């Protein structure tokens, strides 16, 4: 890899770290091509991705923002999983690591400055995604309106049943 390619890789990694909500750092040693492809497909379904990175280039892309903690993350054969939101890549990586013990979660990087350990990444994976939170919020907002509409319509429905009862009584 010559200097131009290295610089291009560093710029690519800088954009990954800048655009991703969180980056999950994993050791992938021992994964077969089929297993890695399965992981890539799962991540792609959620709009996330995984990329095998060279440790020195990843550290240069972070410009030393992580200090010694970052040096500990990027050792050995490293792949980074990342996505547009902070939760999706972490959820899929943790789930895959549970199913396949060859993938090891090392830690993560949150907002280019905060280093997460393995427990932090696992905790991040338990959080609801942004879409799930939006759905819950909309449900909470709509619930009172639905109840009010039901209460307001109830007297009219009861009155209609009373009139119907009188009409059937008179007809009989």
From Swiss-Prot:
Keyword Endoplasmic reticulum carried by entry: no
Transmembrane segments: none
Gene Ontology terms for molecular function: large ribosomal subunit rRNA binding; structural constituent of ribosome
One GO CC annotation: large ribosomal subunit
Stored SUPFAM superfamilies: Ribosomal protein L10-like
Gene3D superfamilies: 3.30.70.1730, 6.10.250.290
UniProt-listed InterPro entries: Ribosomal_uL10, Ribosomal_uL10-like_sf, Ribosomal_uL10_bac, Ribosomal_uL10_bac_type, Ribosomal_uL10_CS_bac
Superkingdom of source: Bacteria
Keywords: Ribonucleoprotein, Ribosomal protein, RNA-binding, rRNA-binding
An individual GO BP term: translation
Listed NCBIfam families: PRK00099.1-1 (NF000955)
Membership in a protein family: Belongs to the universal ribosomal protein uL10 family.
Record text on subunit structure and interactions: Part of the ribosomal stalk of the 50S ribosomal subunit. The N-terminus interacts with L11 and the large rRNA to form the base of the stalk. The C-terminus forms an elongated spine to which L12 dimers bind in a sequential fashion forming a multimeric L10(L12)X complex.
PANTHER family in alphabetical order: 39S RIBOSOMAL PROTEIN L10, MITOCHONDRIAL
Physiological role: Forms part of the ribosomal stalk, playing a central role in the interaction of the ribosome with GTP-bound translation factors.
Protein name (record): Large ribosomal subunit protein uL10
Protein's organism: Caulobacter vibrioides (strain NA1000 / CB15N)
GN (gene name): rplJ
């Amino acid at each position: 890899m010559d200097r131009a390619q290295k610089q291009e890789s560093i710029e690519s990694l800088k954009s990954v770290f800048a655009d991703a909500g969180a980056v999950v750092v994993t050791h992938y040693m021992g994964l077969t091509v089929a297993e890695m492809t399965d992981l890539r497909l799962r991540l792609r379904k959620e709009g996330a991705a995984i990329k095998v990175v060279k440790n020195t280039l990843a550290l240069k892309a972070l410009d030393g923002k992580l200090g010694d903690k970052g040096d500990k993350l990027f050792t050995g054969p490293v792949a980074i999983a990342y996505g547009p939101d902070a939760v999706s890549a972490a959820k899929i990586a943790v789930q895959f690591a549970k199913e396949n013990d060859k993938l090891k979660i090392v830690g993560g990087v949150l907002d280019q400055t905060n280093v997460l350990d393995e427990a932090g990444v696992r905790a991040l994976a338990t959080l609801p995604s942004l879409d799930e939170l939006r759905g819950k919020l909309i449900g909470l907002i709509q619930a009172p309106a639905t109840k009010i509409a039901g209460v307001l319509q109830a007297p009219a429905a009861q009155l209609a049943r009373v009139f119907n009862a009188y009409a059937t009584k008179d007809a009989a």
